[in-house]
Swiss-Prot record:
<dbReference type="GO" id="GO:0015979">
    <property type="term" value="P:photosynthesis"/>
</dbReference>
<keyword id="KW-0813">Transport</keyword>
<protein>
    <recommendedName>
        <fullName>Photosystem II extrinsic protein U</fullName>
    </recommendedName>
</protein>
<comment type="subunit">
    <text>PSII is composed of 1 copy each of membrane proteins PsbA, PsbB, PsbC, PsbD, PsbE, PsbF, PsbH, PsbI, PsbJ, PsbK, PsbL, PsbM, PsbT, PsbX, PsbY, PsbZ, Psb30/Ycf12, peripheral proteins PsbO, CyanoQ (PsbQ), PsbU, PsbV and a large number of cofactors. It forms dimeric complexes.</text>
</comment>
<comment type="similarity">
    <text>Belongs to the PsbU family.</text>
</comment>
<dbReference type="GO" id="GO:0031676">
    <property type="term" value="C:plasma membrane-derived thylakoid membrane"/>
</dbReference>
<keyword id="KW-0602">Photosynthesis</keyword>
<dbReference type="GO" id="GO:0009523">
    <property type="term" value="C:photosystem II"/>
</dbReference>
<keyword id="KW-0604">Photosystem II</keyword>
<keyword id="KW-0793">Thylakoid</keyword>
<keyword id="KW-0472">Membrane</keyword>
<comment type="function">
    <text>One of the extrinsic, lumenal subunits of photosystem II (PSII). PSII is a light-driven water plastoquinone oxidoreductase, using light energy to abstract electrons from H(2)O, generating a proton gradient subsequently used for ATP formation. The extrinsic proteins stabilize the structure of photosystem II oxygen-evolving complex (OEC), the ion environment of oxygen evolution and protect the OEC against heat-induced inactivation.</text>
</comment>
<keyword id="KW-0249">Electron transport</keyword>
Amino acid sequence: MLNAVDAKLTTDFGQR
């Protein structure tokens, strides 16, 4: 669960 959230957050940060 945390992995998925971390991946999403990382992607969001990377895109931003």
